[in-house]
Amino acid sequence: MTQLTNSISRSQIEQLVRQALGQQLGSAASPSSAPNPLVVNISARHIHLSQEHLEVLFGKGAQLEIQKDLYQEGYFAATQTVAIVGPRRRMIPNVRVLGPCRGDTQVELAFTDTISLGLEVPIRISGDLENTPGCVLMGPKGVVELDKGVIRAARHVHMSPADCAHYGCANGDKLHLRIESNGCTTVLEDVVVRENPEVKLEVHIDTDEGNAVDLDHATSVKLFVPEGCKCKHS
């Protein structure tokens, strides 16, 4: 018997299985066979605070107070809001804090918000804060000056392992999202997969994107793996 000199890792096997499932299901997985309903939500400008910064802005011992639970279990919009100040004293007031607290403070804005503040902000996955601009946060009890932490959140989809298997994708892959609405049907590319066994299937796009595709009046949404380029180059 001939022995294979190169072993296949578990992650490679999982990827091959997902690809095979994706081929069986077709480039756009059938919604009727999906393990979970596809939900697309607009993520408006918001802030994630560290406990340290929460206490600077709202007073020693401050805790986030729940105003509304979010779609993902354990996450919520807090009653607390702060003002964001950019260069040349440009300000956006009443920006909602989301909970629970995180290890690092992070500000998530749409493109039009960054223009209003006078900031050049990169598109990043949540938590990737190196080489990002900072800003000033103003609360009722104090001020925090961030040297980094302002991002435009990359459009992304939260998926469980069952969802990934259904769509034929893996953590970090980029999918396409087709949104059908009257007069402005659009396909959004580069929807980053964020796999976690504890999440519900949910796509997040920002306010600019949601308005551009008229998400509030969408008649259909479909998530699918992009097909490889079939064009012939000379």
PLM-predicted stretches and their roles:
Residues 1-36:
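Protein-protein interaction and targeting regions used for scaffolding, dimerization, and localization
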Residues 17-25, 58-62, 217, 225:
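Structural signal for hydrophobic packing residues in well-ordered secondary-structure cores
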Residues 27-32, 136-141, 183-186, 229:
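Short amphipathic alpha-helical segments, especially helix-boundary/capping motifs
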Residues 39-41, 46-88, 93-140, 145-178, ...:
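Short beta-strand-centered segments at strand-helix junctions
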Residues 93, 183-191, 228-234:
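Short, Lys/Arg- and Gly-enriched loop/turn segments at beta-strand edges
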Residues 212-234:
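Extended, aromatic/histidine-rich regions of cofactor-dependent oxidoreductases associated
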